[in-house]
């Protein structure tokens, strides 16, 4: 029946050919991934929506993307096959700082700066760059086979998204939730822009703690000593602060001291902020260069002035003009020593804020910026998570979320960049600000057309926090449409825990504020991928494999399967490229098992049409099944129950292992092997055809269950089961459901056969019986029922154990035989003629000596009180477990030796 020989499945699985045939282009061409609001609003379909975290337009595919998008694809494909109107919303982020930096670097190579070009021409260059390179990440994601509705692809600078951003800013300003204020912000001297607190990462740094003496103005023979790690800011000191409860300085409060080098007189003030235990208990107050000092200065009406500029160099007024801040630090310490003000230096390790992108120390900088008041937005966003309206997976990330929300600060949203959404604020010649959706509206409000727009742009995250809304066509407050009514709130967000506050929390705030509902129901936090040494993947370490090269070597399905298989919920992933052999081997196993089953189909059905008709009408019938078939159906339905339960609990890693374990173990290692024996034995045509249809039916169910994980190979093989049209795809097939009628199926007979096969193999291995030699086994059944069960394996035993088996309730044990007991039934394997007794005795004696020595070393270690009391409890428990296992092994080896003696 060659016309349907595995529907021409090649002998060897070639992932290049299969995946090229099924690239997303084919699925897209037939509209597989399209979702329509009409099917929800008019036909009553249940919606299921996933938001793609928009990758930076500057990005290229990483293993982090692979894990994140594979998980999203699994959720969306599963929902689609569960009959839901599944919508996955794709898009990219304009990535303000990153994109501007890339384009500026390109211009510098051409000898041009953005200032040479001017704002308009520079932005034209950025748009040109985006058109040429900005789609790379999406093309690479398509190679992964992800099933987005690509018609809905959105870029955060697209007209619709930009309209939403501007209207949101205007609305929040008019509500009093956006304001312009003079505050200490995080300044990146490389990117030359303000940063939000979340864009600053803390790193441990070793500096000098500098102790400086400040003489009293009225009596320079007396002084007060402070300790600081920033002596370069001494020229901007406006006070010395002490704790009002610190008796050491009680008599100095209100006195004036002389600022070293500067020579100015500043007061000693009392403030509860001062930590009595830190340093000397006295602090220099430099409000322009420290946010805490700034708050102290406001409380005491102190002046504020700066000595470090935007370029992190000392300003003209301070006497060290033009020096880099760190060079100035060294010079000022030297000058303090020369002038007699330096008391001492100490090594000091502390956490310092760095720009996450530029990797330079952030400078606290006093400037006018735009802010969002976060407290009114945070309270309802905290409540919905506390109340369980939004669920986190794993749950422990709720604690991180709570910490952020309970300690929230106003959000600095202005950035000193050109690429981004320009702040919709205009100024008249008197300095009044007019916030409006357009220049024309601003002119109308101001009563003049002589207005200049704010030069700054909005933080990239200001567009991202609206993502659940803008991807569905929302253009601002009071905006509504059919997509929003059908697909908002979305269902599942898959993202990294590192942006819980950057993005997750802010989306929750925006959704609640503008739509009165949460933006999503569940948040799945992905694992961090590390190399095999436990290090985070990075280009600088050279330990970050190129996913496209991995795909070329192992296949997309293999990479997708592997990365989910090794990524338990809430645990870091140790990834080495060689681990993808796991996925490749599994794909090969699926392919080979499918080819075998299809070959049996050819043997039992005269024509393709005959099989197709039989399979279309196939229903598993117990009376036509062998014990292996009934066992398979019991195991298959148990697998489906566990599969769906794992998906309901977001245990994708468990789900993948459940299917892998069933297919490789139950289906291939046991049922397919049993089927070989069954079909070569004395079997009627009806039962044979039924057995093959059962094998194909379960195979098809496994392919459907695996499709969300391995979309290419599953669609390829599914099309080989029966004739399909070009418009058909497994992606829209119904996901198999467990049949409760098989839940209580008595599978004990085949379980006994399986256990007996395993023990025969184990005994052969224990006595070193060569694999190519056939042995004689005798099984003494414990009861008539056990004998009946074992007789169902008569055809299986020779094929799976290379043993001829004699069965009975009163059979005799052969001389010189190895013995064991399986579920109360006695097993004997005749050894005479199979092995050299003397050689085997020598081998066993040598092994006993080796294990005995190991036992003695373990006993010695566990008798050492120091080890037992100091080692971690799990380590001690593991050593005890090894000891028990070794003792059991010696007893078993001694028993085997006895048999040979």
Swiss-Prot record:
Coiled coil regions, renumbered to chain: 831-901
Keywords on record: Aminoacyl-tRNA synthetase, ATP-binding, Coiled coil, Cytoplasm, Ligase, Nucleotide-binding, Protein biosynthesis
Keyword Ribosomal protein on entry: no
Biological process annotations from GO: valyl-tRNA aminoacylation
GO MF: aminoacyl-tRNA deacylase activity; ATP binding; valine-tRNA ligase activity
UniProt free text on domains: ValRS has two distinct active sites: one for aminoacylation and one for editing. The misactivated threonine is translocated from the active site to the editing site. The C-terminal coiled-coil domain is crucial for aminoacylation activity.
Name of the protein in its database record: Valine--tRNA ligase
Originating organism: Chlorobaculum tepidum (strain ATCC 49652 / DSM 12025 / NBRC 103806 / TLS) (Chlorobium tepidum)
């Amino acid at each position: 029946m060659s016309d349907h020989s595995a529907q021409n499945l090649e002998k060897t699985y070639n992932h290049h050919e299969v995946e090229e045939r099924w690239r997303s282009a084919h699925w897209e061409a037939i509209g597989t991934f399209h979702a329509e609001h009409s099917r929800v609003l008019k036909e009553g379909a249940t919606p299921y929506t996933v938001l793609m975290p928009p990758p930076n337009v500057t990005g290229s595919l990483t293993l982090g993307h692979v894990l994140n998008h594979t998980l999203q694809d699994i959720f969306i494909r599963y929902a689609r096959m569960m009959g839901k109107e599944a919508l996955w919303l794709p898009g990219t982020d304009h990535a303000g700082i990153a994109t501007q930096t890339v384009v500026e670097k390109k211009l510098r190579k051409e000898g041009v700066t953005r200032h040479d070009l001017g704002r308009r021409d520079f932005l034209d260059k950025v748009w040109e760059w985006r058109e040429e390179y900005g789609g790379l990440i999406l093309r690479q994601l398509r190679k992964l086979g992800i099933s987005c509705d690509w018609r809905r692809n959105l870029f955060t600078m697209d007209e619709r998204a930009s309209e939403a951003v501007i209207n949101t800013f205007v609305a929040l300003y008019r509500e009093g939730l956006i304001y312009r204020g003079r505050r200490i912000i995080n300044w990146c001297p490389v990117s030359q822009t303000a940063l939000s607190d979340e864009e600053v990462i803390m790193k441990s740094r070793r500096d000098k703690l500098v102790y400086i003496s400040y003489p009293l103005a009225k009596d320079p023979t007396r002084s007060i000593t402070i300790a600081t790690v920033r002596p370069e800011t001494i020229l901007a000191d406006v006070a010395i602060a002490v704790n009002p409860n610190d008796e050491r300085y009680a008599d100095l409060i209100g006195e004036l001291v002389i600022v070293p080098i500067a020579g100015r007189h500043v007061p000693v003030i009392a403030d509860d902020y001062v930590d009595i235990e830190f340093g000397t208990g006295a602090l220099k107050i430099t409000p322009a260069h420290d946010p805490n000092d700034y708050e102290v200065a406001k409380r005491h009406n102190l002046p504020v002035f700066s000595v470090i500029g935007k370029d992190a160099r000392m300003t003209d007024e301070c006497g060290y003009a033009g020096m880099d801040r760190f060079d100035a630090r060294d010079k000022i310490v030297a000058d303090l020593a020369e002038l007699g003000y330096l008391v001492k230096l100490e090594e000091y390790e502390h956490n310092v804020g760095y720009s996450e992108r530029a990797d330079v120390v952030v400078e606290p900088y006093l400037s006018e910026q735009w802010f969002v008041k976060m407290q009114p937005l945070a309270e309802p966003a905290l409540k919905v998570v506390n109340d369980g309206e939004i669920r986190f997976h794993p749950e422990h990330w709720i604690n991180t979320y709570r910490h952020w929300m309970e300690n929230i600060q106003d959000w600095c949203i202005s950035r000193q960049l050109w690429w981004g959404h320009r702040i919709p604020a205009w100024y008249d010649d008197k300095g009044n600000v007019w916030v409006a959706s357009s220049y024309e509206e601003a002119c109308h409000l101001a009563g003049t057309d002589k207005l200049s727009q704010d030069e700054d742009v909005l933080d990239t995250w200001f567009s991202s926090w609206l993502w659940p809304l803008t991807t569905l066509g929302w253009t601002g407050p009071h905006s509504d449409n059919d997509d929003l009514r059908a697909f908002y709130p979305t269902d599942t967000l898959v993202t990294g825990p590192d942006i819980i506050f950057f993005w997750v929390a802010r989306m929750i705030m925006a959704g609640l504020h503008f739509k009165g509902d949460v933006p999503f129901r569940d948040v799945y936090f992905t694992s961090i991928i590390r190399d095999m040494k436990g290090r985070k993947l990075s280009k600088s370490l050279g330990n970050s494999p190129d996913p496209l090269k991995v795909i070329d070597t192992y296949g997309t399905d293999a990479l997708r399967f592997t990365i989910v298989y090794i990524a338990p919920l809430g645990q870091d992933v140790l990834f080495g490229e060689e681990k993808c052999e796991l996925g490749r081997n599994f794909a090969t196993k699926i392919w080979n098992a499918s080819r075998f089953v299809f070959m049996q189909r050819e043997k039992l059905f005269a024509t393709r049409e005959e099989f197709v008709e039989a399979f279309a009408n196939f229903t598993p019938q117990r009376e036509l099944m062998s014990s292996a078939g009934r066992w398979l159906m019991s195991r298959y339905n148990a697998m489906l129950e566990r599969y769906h339960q794992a998906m309901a609990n977001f245990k994708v890693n468990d789900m993948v292992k459940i299917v892998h374990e069933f297919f490789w173990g139950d289906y291939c290692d046991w049922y397919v092997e049993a089927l070989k024996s069954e079909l070569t034995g004395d079997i009627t045509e009806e039962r044979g055809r039924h057995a093959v249809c059962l094998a194909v039916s379960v195979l098809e169910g496994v392919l459907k269950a695996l499709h969300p994980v391995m979309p290419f190979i599953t669609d390829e093989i599914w099309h080989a089961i029966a004739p399909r049209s070009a418009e058909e795809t497994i992606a829209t097939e119904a996901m198999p459901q467990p049949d409760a009628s098989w839940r209580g199926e008595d599978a004990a007979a085949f379980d006994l056969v399986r256990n007996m096969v395993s023990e025969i193999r184990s005994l052969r291995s224990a006595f070193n019986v060569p694999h190519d030699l056939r042995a004689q086994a005798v099984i003494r059944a414990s009861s008539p029922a056990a004998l009946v069960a074992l007789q169902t394996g008569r055809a299986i035993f020779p094929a799976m154990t290379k043993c001829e088996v004699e069965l009975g309730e009163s059979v005799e044990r052969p001389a010189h035989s190895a013995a064991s007991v399986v579920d109360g039934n006695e097993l004997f394997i005749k050894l005479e003629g199979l092995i050299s007794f003397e050689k085997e005795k020598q081998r066993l004696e040598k092994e006993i000596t080796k294990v005995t020595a190991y036992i003695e070393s373990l006993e010695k270690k566990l008798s050492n009180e120091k080890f037992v009391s100091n080692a971690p409890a799990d380590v001690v428990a593991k050593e005890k477990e090894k000891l028990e296992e070794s003792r059991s092994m010696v007893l078993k080896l001694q028993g085997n030796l006895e048999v040979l003696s």
